[in-house]
Curated annotation (Swiss-Prot):
PANTHER family: IMIDAZOLEGLYCEROL-PHOSPHATE DEHYDRATASE (PTHR23133:SF2), IMIDAZOLEGLYCEROL-PHOSPHATE DEHYDRATASE HIS7 (PTHR23133). It is found in: Cytoplasm. Gene3D superfamilies: Imidazole glycerol phosphate dehydratase, domain 1. Its EC number is 4.2.1.19. It comes from the Bacteria. It catalyses: D-erythro-1-(imidazol-4-yl)glycerol 3-phosphate = 3-(imidazol-4-yl)-2-oxopropyl phosphate + H2O. The keyword Amino-acid biosynthesis applies. One of its GO terms (biological process) is L-histidine biosynthetic process. Pathway: Amino-acid biosynthesis; L-histidine biosynthesis; L-histidine from 5-phospho-alpha-D-ribose 1-diphosphate: step 6/9. This is Imidazoleglycerol-phosphate dehydratase.
């Protein structure tokens, strides 16, 4: 939530289930300082990219049943990250609200668009069919690219934002995945940024 005395937009969210134990600290007005430890190396890499390119200060410490499969840890972390984002936004006064970004990564081009609307919605298009079955190896737990959709959907619904993510073209599953995360990061950076010309909530209804 927004601290009325300091103006900082921060949140700390903890979530513990039988499958995972997750703590997320988020500062929307940070400088891209990140500390990510989920036990799934490629997911750590993606969240590091997200925090860095959004210029958020982001700490994620997660443990889970990765000896079975990393899915629970990854999806549950996205849930908590979305909750932290929603809380940190507070009343949403003064934000730009909308953001979008095109991100190229070698042969891949991805696009993300965000509306901090308070109406959760998610659209995910363009990934090649083989992404459903592809696995990116890791030293402790692999990352299955089929979960990309679940990550962004969980983030959107728990942050209560509208998020559209599309792969315009691409071939390498690593590049496709990373370009999507970076596009989401840059779109979020725009959308949550404070606009000096906006003093209230950026909605004709007066609330988001």
């Amino acid at each position: 939530m927004t601290d009325m005395l300091t103006g900082t937009r921060r949140a700390r969210v903890e979530r513990k289930t039988k499958e995972s134990d997750i703590v997320v600290d988020l500062d929307l007005d940070g400088t891209g300082i990140v500390d990510i430890r989920t036990g799934v190396p490629f997911f750590d890499h993606m969240l590091t990219s997200l925090g860095s390119h959004a210029s958020f200060d982001l700490t994620v410490h997660a443990t889970g049943d990765i000896e079975i499969e990393g899915h629970h840890t990854v999806e549950d972390t996205a849930i908590v990250l979305g909750q932290a984002l929603g809380q940190a936004l507070g009343d949403k006064k003064g934000i730009r609200r909308f953001g979008d970004a095109f991100i190229p990564m070698d042969e891949t081009l991805a696009h993300a668009a965000v509306d901090v609307s308070g109406r959760p919605y998610f659209v995910h298009t363009g990934e090649p069919d083989y992404m459903v079955e592809f696995t990116i190896a890791g030293s402790s737990a692999p990352y299955h690219t089929v979960i990309n959709r679940h990550v962004f959907e969980s983030l959107a619904f728990n942050a209560r934002i509208a998020l559209h993510v599309r792969t315009i073209y691409g071939r390498d599953p690593h590049h496709i995945t990373e370009a999507q995360y970076k596009a989401v990061a840059r779109a979020l950076r725009q959308a949550v940024e404070l606009d000096p010309r906006v003093t209230g909530v950026p909605s004709t209804k007066g609330s988001l």
